[in-house]
Regions:
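Short capping loops/turns at secondary-structure boundaries
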Residues: 7-14, 26, 30
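Inter-helical turn/loop segments and adjacent helix faces that build the functional surface
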Residues: 21-39, 53-69, 98-102
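Extended, helix-rich structural scaffolds rather than catalytic motifs
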Residues: 64-172
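Conserved small/polar residues in nucleotide/adenosyl-binding loops
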Residues: 1-6
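Alpha-helical transition-metal enzyme core signature, strongest for iron centers
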Residues: 10-21, 40-51, 55
Length: 172
């Protein structure tokens, strides 16, 4: 597997999945669905953990230029992912004022909560593996997500508990 694929899939896309499943869990009133999501989130967190553990060691062996290239790739993936969460194409297709619609959408609780869930999963892991470099740090700051860099965990990965057998006490 190409390292870009691993960064893109196991850090960025799996982080997106964690955010989506967490949002669904937060907004659902169905206890069975919430229990199912708990298990799915745990499984997704294991995928991210594998990627973090692998990439953390692998990236240490790259040259500064190679690391900066991968850091820029991860940043660009975050920008694309953030942009895909907004529905500019839909607004345009329906003939709505795109700027007004995007401004409205960016202020909704659902959008803000999802963006928070998304970047609190992705940014701490990018930092942990060494992809928040001096070159891209200002770009993440402009994106408004650099505050998450120093979070000790992404909210789903409890490194110690993932080594333990599955605890079903949190389910119904």
């Amino acid at each position: 597997m190409c390292i870009r694929d691993s960064i893109g899939m196991q850090i960025i896309i799996e982080g997106l999945a964690l955010a989506a499943f967490n949002l669904a869990k937060q907004t659902s009133n169905d206890p069975v669905f919430r229990d199912m999501l708990y298990l799915i989130i745990r499984d997704e967190a294991r995928h991210v953990t594998f990627g973090v553990n692998y990439l953390e060691e692998y990236l240490k062996n790259l040259s500064k230029d190679e690391l900066d290239e991968r850091a820029m790739f991860a940043y660009e993936a975050c920008v694309v992912m953030r942009g895909r969460l907004l529905s500019a194409e839909v607004y345009e297709k329906f003939g709505w004022n795109v700027e007004e619609s995007l401004e409205f959408q960016s202020k909704t609780d659902v959008t803000n909560n999802f963006q928070h869930l998304l970047f609190t999963r992705v940014v701490p892991n990018l930092s942990r593996i060494g992809l928040i470099t001096d070159k891209v740090r200002p770009l993440y700051d402009e994106l408004g997500v650099l505050d998450y860099e120093s979070w000790p965990t992404d909210g789903d990965i409890d490194w110690a508990s993932l080594k333990q057998p599955l605890d079903l006490s949190e389910t119904a």
